[in-house]
Amino acid sequence: MRITYISKSIIPSRTANSIHVMKMCQAFADNGHEVVLLAPDSKNEYEKDINDIYDNYGVRKNFKIKKLYHPDIKGGVIIYTLAIFFYLLINKKFDLVYGRFLHGIYVATLLNNKVVYETHAPLLDRKSHRQIIFKRLVKSKYFKKMVVISQALKNIYLDRGYLQDSKIQVAHDGADTVENFNHKIDLLGSKDNLKVGYTGHLYKGKGMEVIASMADKLDEDVEIHIIGGLEKDIKFWKNKI
C-alpha cells in the first residue's frame, strides 16, 4: 500500500510528536508499505546542526520526507494546509492518507482520498473551528477510521457521540524492540553510585520540579541523570539546581 503521512511536527526537532511521526513512518515501511511523510518547511524552528534527519531520530531511511511551505506568520497553518491540498491534488499515486494533523486530513477527503486520523487528545472546545472541521471529517464517506492511544480516550469520543464504536481503533503507544539488554552506556559520575534516569521535556508540569525539590535530599551515592529538553529549559535548570 502507498501511504501519505500528514504531519505538522517540526522535523528535525526535540519534540516527542516528531519522534512519534518518524517512528510511525518507519513502522509502516517495515510492514511493506511505500510511505511519504509530509512535514512543514519551518527552517526557523529546526533543531540546529543536524546533518542526517533519519540518523538523528534513529530510524532507517525506508521512507521519503517531503517538506511543504509553512511560513512563520500568523495564519501560517492555513497556508500549510493549502500546500498539502495542492500536493495531494498533483501527486495522486497513493492509496491512503494517514496522520495527526486534523486540517490536512480533512482537506484530503475533499480530494476523495481515503483517510485515517490519529489523535492523542480529546476536542475540549466544542465551539472551536477544530470542532467544525472534525465533525465534517467524520461525516465524509472517505473517513475510514480514527486511531486513539487509550481506551479512556476512545470512551470520551464515544460518550460525546462523535463516532460509533467500530470507527475508533485503540492503538496504544509502543516502542522499538530492545535487541540487546546487556548494552551499557557510560554515564558521568561514579560507577558505584545508583543512577536514576529521567527522559523527556523539562518545562513546567513534566516532573522536573519534583526532581529539583528532592535532589538535595538524596544520599550522596544516588545520581540523577536527565536527558532531554530544549536549550532554554536546560539552561534554566542548570542555573537553578
Cite the ranges covered by each PLM segment.
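Nucleotide-sugar donor phosphate/pyrophosphate-binding loop at the beta->alpha transition
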Residues: 75-83, 111-114, 119-142, 155, ...
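An amphipathic, basic-hydrophobic alpha-helix
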Residues: 51-97, 106-110, 130-137
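N-terminal strand-loop element at the rim of the active site
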Residues: 5-15, 27-79, 229-233
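Conserved donor-binding/catalytic core segment of Leloir-type glycosyltransferases
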Residues: 4, 147, 188-215, 219, ...
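Acidic anion/phosphate-binding donor-loop and adjacent secondary structure
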Residues: 125-129, 158-159, 167-193, 204-207
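Short His-centered aromatic/hydrophobic patch
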Residues: 98-104, 119
